[in-house]
Amino acid sequence: MASMDSTPPIDCHRLIVLFFEAIPGVNQIKAAADKLPRPAAVHLAQCDAHSERAAMWTRNPTGRLAIGRLALEYASEALDWETATAFADTLGGEAHWCLGASPIAHPLNTALTFSGTLQLCCFERREGLSDEELKHIWFNEHAPVAVETQNNVGYRQNLVLSSSHSPLDGIVEELFPIAAAASLTDFFADGDDPEKMMNHIQRLTESSERVLDLEKSSVIHMTEQRLL
């Protein structure tokens, strides 16, 4: 199990583009991105035969489940909103401009495809949470629980500031080894201990419900690759 950074500060801005109908090709993405300020990293995730192995984790109470995700990372507010939405429109996606934190750094340091799966969770906050409460609870209190109770090897939080379509509050990106795709015990980082597994599930569920509305959150697994 990966270890969490001692403090998960907001360390970047991310433009998250979600695709619901079709996913653009890599060359199309690169051509469109050439017109933007150069990002520090670009990741593309999409549903395919590989990620389908983790279909048991899919949740779609909202009826809107993304089939692809593009993430561009910037060290500062280098991208204005009008440019961001135009970029997403060109690719046929929805733009979400976010403050980003990385409790567990992304394991792909070069242009490779991750051997496991990316779990993408798009959510609206629990009713009654203010902006500051959402930010504090999610980044400072929930993040350690999410790391302690799951076998995630990458964990990135995206607090949504602006959305071109869906009114999302947060986008979670977690990377899991392929062994966790169809195994409760491998997913919840407990080996073969059923009692510990149930404890992890209970802790994670209770902590998650402090942050998000489970009936307004979707979960899908994708195959992740780094383009830049």
Regions found by a protein language model. Name each.
Residues 2-228:
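Macromolecular interaction modules
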